[in-house]
């Protein structure tokens, strides 16, 4: 067992959106922070979202129908946080126009006033004007939409983003301010002082194959769907707080959507809504919402896929089949238990708990409110005298890594021998940091592509190892460039090249390279 000599203020367990957000908030306030993630960063539900930064139009409908103030407050908070999100991560998050197909004039009036309330709630934080276009114009936008009884499209604006890139940006920003973040480090035991209060953790580093101990003033459990498992490890008598919900998404060719605007399907057979969204030159469809149990690597189930296909096909002339699916995935939402009969009805609010041994756990919430969740948690630590107050929260005005003005770099980027497709891909994935990738490619005189049918440079592999915490090939293919979320077959076609390039950089022997190829292909096969 190796011991760390230094005692830190905070150990965070979990490298998803909440853990990463807490790492940044706490570091900016002047605390020493170590974040430990048992797999890769964003390997859980945080990379398996609908990629929306939204106030929650569907939560507003529930608030009105059920006269539910909690749902209303969630929308209000979401709209406020959406504005901060888009400002601080403008390289990753963009506004998106979303169209709602309308098939009756009564529904037109109902939806129009719902969107009006949504816009009025946003006040000066609105992203754009709501609008209505008739049937003819709607069909021009979406030729495949079901035309019988179509009255037109009602449109509104929300935000969209690359969730896995947001995690990396948060972590890079936190590290630049002094945080230490480690992936593939699994906490397997808590340390306790003479008063039986938590004083640190024991963890196993899967890359170095070593056990370590670290002492801390506070240990935060931000492990998402695993929150209850860690709470029970601390206190076997504790009550579980999570109601786990699975949500799947499928990806098909962008031709199905035929525009850069999203579509919201407002009336499904079970009262949910489904989003069909442009996503990195593909089309993303989701989501489902079903009770589930904790699973390390959940996979989209047959019945969930059939549900999405059936509901989507009700709205389109040309039907989707399973053969059209290029990738699919399942994420587990860590919702907080309530008296609601279904997980879909549960309010997406968050909760912070302190155990009798001072383990601090946070659960619930949603991607859009990750920053507020982090702020609330660090403020909770100060209020409960677990940490001495230092600085105020600064995350409302902290621009994230890669968010410098890309326009100033455009001329410089144009000098490099890359295609327009590669240039756009680099800007989308790395923002202003794309110039670092290009400089690295230039230094090694290697502008070779990983695959001639894809925009990714081999130099991106080395950059992501040096700058973005990549330890395994699946980290790169799934959660740095996102290819696994787009096209499983294309991702599989890149495995050998990525493993061999990583082998050269990290000095793997042939046996290790072959082992990584096998493991990576097994992982990718989880994507449909």
Features from the language model and the residues they span:
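Short hydrophobic core segments
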Residues: 13, 214-224
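N-terminal Rossmann-like FAD-binding beta1-loop-alpha1 element of flavoenzymes
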Residues: 9-35
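Glycine-rich FAD pyrophosphate-binding loop
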Residues: 28-49
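Dinucleotide-binding Rossmann-like beta1-alpha1 core, especially the glycine-rich loop
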Residues: 51-141, 274
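A conserved short coil-to-beta-strand element within the FAD-binding core of flavoproteins
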Residues: 183-199
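C-terminal accessory subdomains/tails of enzymes that are appended
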Residues: 25, 39, 92, 99, ...
């Amino acid at each position: 067992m190796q011991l760390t000599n230094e005692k830190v203020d905070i150990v965070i367990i979990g490298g998803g959106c909440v853990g990463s957000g807490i790492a940044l908030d706490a570091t900016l306030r002047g605390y020493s922070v170590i974040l430990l993630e048992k797999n890769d960063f964003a390997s859980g539900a945080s990379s398996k979202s609908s990629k929306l930064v939204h106030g929650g139009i569907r939560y507003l409908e529930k608030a009105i129908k059920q006269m539910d103030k909690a749902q209303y407050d969630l929308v209000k908070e979401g709209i406020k946080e959406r504005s901060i999100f888009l400002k601080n991560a403008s390289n990753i998050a963009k506004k998106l126009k979303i169209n709602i197909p309308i098939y009756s004039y009564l529904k037109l009036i109902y939806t129009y006033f719902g969107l009006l309330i949504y816009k009025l709630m946003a006040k000066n934080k609105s992203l754009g004007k709501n609008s209505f276009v008739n049937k003819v114009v709607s069909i021009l936008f979406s030729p495949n939409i079901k035309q019988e009884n179509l009255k037109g499209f009602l449109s509104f604006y929300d935000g969209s983003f690359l969730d896995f890139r947001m995690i990396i940006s948060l972590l890079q920003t936190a590290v630049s301010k002094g945080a230490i973040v480690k992936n593939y480090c699994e906490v397997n035991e808590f340390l306790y002082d003479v008063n039986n209060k938590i004083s640190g953790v024991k963890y196993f580093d899967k890359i170095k194959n070593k056990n370590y101990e670290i002492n801390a003033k506070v240990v935060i459990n931000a492990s998402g769907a695993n929150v209850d498992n860690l709470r029970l490890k601390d206190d076997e008598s504790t009550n579980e707080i999570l109601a786990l919900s699975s949500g799947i998404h499928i990806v098909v060719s962008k031709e199905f959507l035929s525009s850069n605007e999203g579509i919201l399907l407002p009336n499904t057979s079970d009262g949910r809504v489904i989003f069909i969204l442009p996503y990195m030159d593909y089309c993303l469809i989701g989501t489902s919402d079903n009770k589930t149990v904790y699973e390390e690597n959940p996979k989209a189930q047959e019945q969930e896929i059939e549900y999405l296909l059936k509901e989507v096909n009700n709205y389109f002339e040309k039907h989707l089949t399973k053969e059209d699916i290029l990738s699919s995935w399942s994420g587990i939402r860590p919702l907080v238990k309530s008296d609601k009969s279904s997980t879909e009805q549960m309010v997406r609010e968050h909760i912070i708990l302190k155990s009798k041994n001072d383990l601090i756990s946070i659960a619930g919430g949603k991607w859009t409110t990750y920053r507020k969740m982090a702020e609330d948690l660090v403020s909770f630590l100060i209020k409960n005298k677990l940490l001495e107050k230092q600085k105020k929260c600064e995350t409302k005005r902290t621009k994230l890594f890669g968010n410098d003005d890309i326009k100033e770099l455009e001329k410089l980027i144009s000098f490099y021998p890359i295609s327009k497709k590669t240039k756009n891909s680099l800007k989308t994935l790395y923002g202003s940091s794309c110039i670092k990738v290009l400089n690295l490619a230039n230094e090694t005189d290697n502008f070779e592509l990983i695959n001639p049918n894809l925009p990714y440079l081999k130099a991106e592999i080395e950059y992501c190892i040096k700058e973005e915490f990549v330890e395994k090939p699946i980290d790169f293919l799934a959660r740095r460039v996102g290819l696994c979320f787009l096209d499983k077959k294309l991702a599989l076609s890149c495995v050998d090249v990525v493993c061999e390039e990583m082998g050269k950089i990290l000095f793997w022997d042939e046996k290790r390279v072959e082992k990584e190829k096998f493991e990576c292909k097994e992982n990718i096969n989880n994507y449909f």
